[in-house]
Amino acid sequence: KQRSGESQNIIVGSWGAKVS
């Protein structure tokens, strides 16, 4: 989910950093 995390990183912000 690293690539998906990058897209969500824009939406969720810091939460996306935890995904990536």
UniProtKB/Swiss-Prot annotation:
Keyword Lipoprotein among record annotations: no
Keywords carried by this UniProt record: IgA-binding protein, Lectin
Region (Disordered): 1-20
Role played: D-galactose-specific lectin, binds the T-antigen structure Gal-beta1,3-GalNAc (Thomsen-Friedenreich-antigen-specific lectin). Potent and selective stimulant of distinct T- and B-cell functions. Shows a unique ability to specifically recognize IgA-1 from human serum.
Assembly notes: Tetramer of four alpha chains associated with two or four beta chains.
Sequence similarity: Belongs to the jacalin lectin family.
Name of the protein in question: Agglutinin beta-1 chain
Organism (species): Artocarpus tonkinensis
Top-level taxonomy: Eukaryota, Viridiplantae, Streptophyta, Embryophyta, Tracheophyta
